[in-house]
Amino acid sequence: MPESASTARIFSTDHFVLPLPPDHRFPMAKYARLRERVAAVAGDLLAVPEAATPAQLALAHDPAYVNAVKAGTLPDAALRRIGFPWSPAMIERSRRSAGATVAACRSALASGCGINLAGGTHHAH
């Protein structure tokens, strides 16, 4: 479906999977299952979001924190708060999740509805 100002969108980031240990408490697989169920009833509304830009991240995050996350130099205590082991995939997933929120907000402003299926997996510091 071509995007237009009046088209609601549903943004999914389940394609950006974190490499987690088998015993990790985070249920990563639920996002793919959710997208599959949404696709069955509204697949034409699904979209993969762009990654949040550095400028967008700077609106909600301390630049030193963003740089430390990107470089993989966060202290162990900060990584424990995040709850995920550092990896390039964690950076991409986080940027896509934040980008999905931005995109869903823009969709809601334009069409009255925008949904981020990955909401809740990103936490600002």
Model-derived features: positions:
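HDAC/HDAC-like amidohydrolase catalytic core signature
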Residues: M1-H125
